[in-house]
Amino acid sequence: MSRHVLKLDEIGRDIARIALPAALALTADPIASMMDTAFIGQIGPVELAAVGVSIALFNQVSRIAIFPLVSVTTSFVAEEDTIGKLSPEAQESESLETGSHVNSESKELIPQNDPVEGASKSKSLISIFEVSKIENERRHIPSASSALVIGAILGFVQAIFLISGAKPLLNFMGVSSDSPMLIPAQQYLTLRSLGAPAVLLSLAMQGVFRGFKDTKTPLYATVAGDITNIILDPIFMFIFRLGVSGAAIAHVISQYLISIILLWRLMEQVDLLPPSFRHLQFGKFLKNGLLLLMRVIAVTFCVTLSASLAARQGATSMAAFQVCLQVWLTTSLLADGLAVSGQAILASAFAKKDYEKVTATASRVLQLGLLLGLMLAVILGLGLSFGARLFTSDVDVLHVISIGIPFVVGTQPINALAFVFDGVNFGASDFAYSAYSMVLVAIISIICLLFLSSSYKFIGIWVALTIYMSLRASAGFWRIGTRTGPWKFLRSC
């Protein structure tokens, strides 16, 4: 099958159609942020540092809610949309003959991880069949409505939390009360937090569109918002002389524009008002969302601890580590595009019990992930030694970066596989395993980080991070290789 990894058959076209726009959308925001940074840098170094701290704080708080919300929404919407499209006329006819038929069919359409979870999914999908009569009408997708409500609530909670606690939170981030960074940092964080509801709402809608296997609409909306942000930045900052406040206002406007575009497009396809409150899927979202929240905390703690350990080794090591880490993480955005496509296609295939497509899709995205990782390793191996000078001209920092480059380059195939395995497991709605396995991986990795960094300093940190990513990839491989959980069907293949 490896010879056909790049073949543009039906699965290959589906993967490309979803993965490429998803990867472009994921890279659009970092590019816009770089433009933001360039404009803010024109004001002064204090303002640049202040905004950097505020953005780091905002992103850290947002990440806790964003990842579980988007991942859960993508899988659930894909499942419900697929089931809603499965011969609606036949389902309606059969339901007139006997009400028990719907229950038995819906049970068969759900991958059974365990009896309790299967019963829960079967019960929720009965209500979906009741409201999913699609006759040239907008679709009824309960998980889409649920995601938007949860996203809006989380956005308002985040805004209130960041605005009311801006000063103490910035103090916690290292900006003291007498620091010249405090006032601009507080101004920027307070204003940017007004856009939190739009950020969470737009990402919830991106999850819905991903569930529909549509990543082009989020791409167009994101590009429109980012272009607006780039245009408004110099106008508000320099013409209106609002400084860092102008940058924050421009960003907030762009986020609300993205939300409006996505909401407009979504309302054309989906009836967002459910027939009644009981059709919403809050319980399912909260259960699986909390599992992924636990996973996000484990991942964040490992990366944050590694940065903290590098900082303890001095400014030179920390500067070199930040350059290596940013390159290491940025390349993962391309693998995330594959993960998104794998998740959406697999969730749909599992809902239809099309195990042949499940096997073919999982195999293809993993092969593409490995190929992507090898390509990134070659590109970074050839270019990073020279490209490092774009980040710094300090000789000592460049020397330490050269020590980290072999790890950054060598782990690219492992990283790509780890991220794609995440998408594969999410597509199988295997959220519990993903969460618990990541906690175990984090515990082992934290021990390695503490021991190796104390013994081998900078190299030790990167050896530990290599172990961390290897364990993440191994956990994904183990689940499929042992044919357990949603992959039990492989035993009969």
Name each model feature, range by range.
Residues R17-D36, L191, G225, S254-I258, ...:
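Transmembrane helical elements of multi-pass membrane transporters/channels
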Residues I11, K121-S124, F129-S145, F161-R192, ...:
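Membrane-interface helix-capping segments at transmembrane helix termini in multi-pass transporters
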Residues T74, L191-R210, P218-D226, A247-I260, ...:
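Short runs within selected transmembrane alpha-helices of multi-pass transporters and secretion channels
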Residues L48-F156, S202-P218, A320-V378, L382-L384, ...:
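Small-residue-rich hydrophobic transmembrane alpha-helices
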Residues M1-A19, S93-L109, N113, A248-H251, ...:
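Interhelical loop/hinge segments that connect adjacent transmembrane helices in multipass membrane
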Residues L8-I11, I134-E137, K216, A224-S259, ...:
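Membrane-interface helix-loop junctions in multi-pass transport and translocation proteins
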Residues S164, S177-M205, G283, V327-T331, ...:
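Alpha-helical transmembrane segments of multi-pass membrane proteins
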Residues T27-A49, L170-S179, I235-R241, L293, ...:
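Helix-terminus/linker motif at the lipid-water interface of multi-pass membrane proteins
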